[in-house]
């Protein structure tokens, strides 16, 4: 299930339910499609190797910095960079460590695209965030908050007409 600092909706129902019944949760997307790497900045073009450039034409305005949700992300990223710098962490390490912090999360799928991204993700495996930093992150993005519903909305094949109706 998707879980990262910008997509925290599962904290409302999925994670508490899994905790109650002793079920471990495998999450993915700890970098929110690259947003939490720190590479996206206000008034700067997206890097050439970024998902925004590679998939921008296919995914429409999802990466448009003028979208309201993306403006919110850019505002939050300014503060997240400050918190990461104060903690002496790269943004990616902060994001990976945060995603693994919830007690119901048993595993975080990292999804690197390059060997350098893999090395960076491996280096973040031993990072532990202190309670003050976790509290600051909760203040910034309150528990249970989804910044952008586009991130958490996926086609649900089980709701398609083909699956819900008998063949005629």
Please report, for each region that a protein language model flagged, where it lies by residue:
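Active-site PLP-lysine loop of aminotransferase-like
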Residues: 2-9, 29-31, 97
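Conserved, mostly hydrophobic/aromatic
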Residues: 18, 25-28, 80, 94-95, ...
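Hydrophobic faces of well-ordered beta-strands that scaffold small-molecule active sites
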Residues: 1, 25-27, 108-110
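Positions that flank functional sites
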Residues: 32-33, 99, 114
